[in-house]
Amino acid sequence: MGRVRTKTVKKSSRQVIEKYYSRMTLDFHTNKKILEEVAIIPSKRLRNKIAGFSTHLMKRIQKGPVRGISLKLQEEERERRMDFVPDESAIKTDEIKVDKETLEMLASLGMSDTSGISAVEPQQAMAPIAAFGGRAPRRY
């Protein structure tokens, strides 16, 4: 079984990645040296744990956004996706095709004069095909 990472390791790792994301890599030894330069960590063991978790998080960040880490690159990407406006609406309301029954319902509600509504003949549902040569299914 794996070891449990403490809250200290997780929090400090996330903070270091947010501040020094451009310097961090997917290599443990490089991340350990960077941590030695940028942070004051009381013990070698704790520094190694933070470097290891930072490396783990960097690998996860490569695959996609990670919960709890806010990076400028990811923020910009998210904003770009949210601000996207399609050229043509997915919901077209130029012409709405309804059957006679729906048209009568709209008329009873006083909405028969709404533009773009046209009556269409309802489609007949296909009869179900008998399975297994037309015999009844087995009873267990």
From Swiss-Prot:
Alphabetized UniProt keyword annotations: Ribonucleoprotein, Ribosomal protein
Gene Ontology CC annotation, any one: cytosolic small ribosomal subunit
Any one GO molecular function term: mRNA binding
Matches recorded under Gene3D superfamilies: Ribosomal protein S17e-like (1.10.60.20)
InterPro entries referenced in this protein's UniProt entry, alphabetically: Ribosomal_eS17, Ribosomal_eS17_CS, Ribosomal_eS17_sf
Pfam families assigned: Ribosomal_S17e (PF00833)
PROSITE patterns tied to this protein: RIBOSOMAL_S17E
SUPFAM superfamilies named in the record: Rps17e-like
Family (UniProt): Belongs to the eukaryotic ribosomal protein eS17 family.
HAMAP family, sorted: Ribosomal_eS17
Name of this chain's protein: Small ribosomal subunit protein eS17y
Species: Arabidopsis thaliana
